[in-house]
Every structure is written in C-alpha cells, then in structure tokens.
Design a protein with these regions (language model features):
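Internal amphipathic alpha-helical repeat/solenoid segments
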Residues: 31-39
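C-terminal domain/tail detector
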Residues: 2-29, 47, 54-87, 217-244
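Short, N-terminal intrinsically disordered low-complexity segments that are rich in Pro/Gly
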Residues: 7-8, 39-43
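All-alpha helical catalytic cores of prenyl diphosphate-utilizing isoprenoid enzymes
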Residues: 26, 43-53, 63-186
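Short, highly charged low-complexity linear segments
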Residues: 109-121, 201-213, 228-241
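Divalent-cation-assisted or electrostatically stabilized phosphate/pyrophosphate-binding catalytic cores
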Residues: 128-138, 186-219
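Short basic/hydrophobic patches in alpha-helices and adjacent helix-turn junctions
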Residues: 171-174, 178-181, 196, 213-221
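Alpha-helical structural motif
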Residues: 14, 49, 96, 207-211
C-alpha cells in the first residue's frame, strides 16, 4: 500500500524533504530487504520506521543534506540487506556484523560509540550494555540499525538523544508487530515481547504499558508522531488474549 510524503508530514510530523526523499526513492536492486518491492516505502513498520527515525535525527540537529547524502543512504540500504538475510537465517549474526563493520571501514565518525556498539551486539543474547539495549531482549532485535549512527557526525549530546529516541521508537514498532504476531510467534518459537512478559492479559497489559511510556518519550521530540502511535493503540486492543 502506498504512503505519501504528505501523509508522513500530516500524520507523523515527518519533515517533508525527508518524507519525499524516501517515498520517491527507487527500491535498490539486489537487496533482500526490498526484494520484490515496487515501492521504497510501504505500510509496514520496517519501512515506515526509516523516514520516521531519520526525521528524529533531523530534529536533534543533523542537517538534511548529511542525512540524505547518497553514500550514507547506500550504506544504510546495504545494512538492511544483511539484516534481513540474518533475520531469514540465511547468514549468521557474526557474518552480518562482520560484513557491516567492513562496510564501515574508513567511515566511522565516533570510535567510542562504534566499539561500544560492537561489544553490545556481540552478545549471544542482547542485554543492556553501556548506552545500548532495553531489559527485554526481544525488543533489541533490530539494534543492528544503530550502525547508521556510526556513519554520521553526531556530537556527544546527539548520540545520547539518538539512542534514547531509538529505544522509544523502534521497540514501539516491534511491540505492534509482536502483539499482532503473538499466536504465530508462540507456535513457531520466535522472539516476542509478550512471551517475555508473561503472556495472557497480564502480559498484554505490561506490553501496552511499555508502549505508552515510549509514546511519552517520543512526545518530547515529535508530539504529532506520539499522538499517531497513541491512536494506534486502539487497533492493538483486538489482540488482547482472553486467557493466559
């Protein structure tokens, strides 16, 4: 389904230049994340989250021309390619990390955060370490995307903000996916935050409480996006389990 730059701006507060750049961009060839896609951005959290997070980076002071620099975007797209290969179990986590790190050679803007991210992602189970991670490993499963920050000229405050708002934004998208996919994930033994939080109505309520707290944090940087996510909560209520 098509989503327009105007929708991004009107409903989620995304800067129009950023929204238009991604909406109008041609899906990269030979890239597993966009494989078979006619549109660069469609209605799926994995796609929508890209312009939304880049808008947050713009809001914390990263210029648009740096964020949308072609070399940087090509790196981000390659990162997504290897991330989805790992998600599909076509490559190991170590192969994914090694390849992404090789892509970053000569590009690293902050070695301290880069090395800290390497140590964090090298864990067999992603538990909080340094500035990275939340207490629920299933909500850390997309954190390889944070390597995009290593390719950008962030100062110390911007690093802290970029990480803080990442952990408010992307786990919220994962919570949406996990609530919708709960029964399927449980049957197939996949990661799911509701399974971590105890399942049943109690687990559902704990999951929603996390979601609401994330929306409060997002409100600090983008009130319109926070309202959009809050409004989406009603759609998630249909997934509340009737019994444990």
């Amino acid at each position: 389904m098509f989503i327009s730059a105007n929708q991004f701006e009107r409903e989620m507060g995304v800067n129009k230049t950023i929204g238009k750049f991604f909406v109008d961009r041609k899906p990269p060839e030979n890239n597993s994340f966009w494989k078979g896609r006619l549109l660069y951005i469609s209605f799926g959290n994995g796609f929508v989250s890209i312009p939304v997070y880049y808008d947050i980076l713009f809001r914390i002071g990263i210029p648009v021309e740096i964020l949308l620099n072609e070399d940087h975007i090509l790196f981000m797209e390659q990162l997504m390619h290897y991330a989805i290969l790992h998600e599909k179990r076509e490559i190991s986590m170590q192969e994914e990390l090694n390849t992404i790190c090789s892509l970053l050679k000569g590009r690293i803007q902050n070695s301290k955060y880069y090395e800290a991210l390497n140590l964090y992602l090298d864990q067999p189970v992603l538990k909080p370490m340094g500035p990275f991670g939340v207490p629920f490993p299933s909500l850390n499963r997309a954190d390889v995307f944070l390597y995009v920050l290593c390719d950008l000229p962030l100062n110390e405050m911007q690093w802290q903000q970029a990480i803080r708002f990442w952990y408010a934004l992307h786990p919220s998208y994962l919570i949406m996916d996990d609530l919708r996919d709960y029964a399927k994930d449980k049957e197939e033994g996949e990661e799911n935050v509701m399974i971590e939080l105890g399942e049943g109505t109690e687990g559902f309520e704990k999951t929603l409480e996390l979601y609401r707290k994330n929306c409060e944090t997002i409100h600090e940087i983008n009130p319109l996006l926070a309202q959009f996510l809050t409004n989406s909560e009603e759609d998630l209520m249909v997934f509340v389990p009737l019994k444990a």
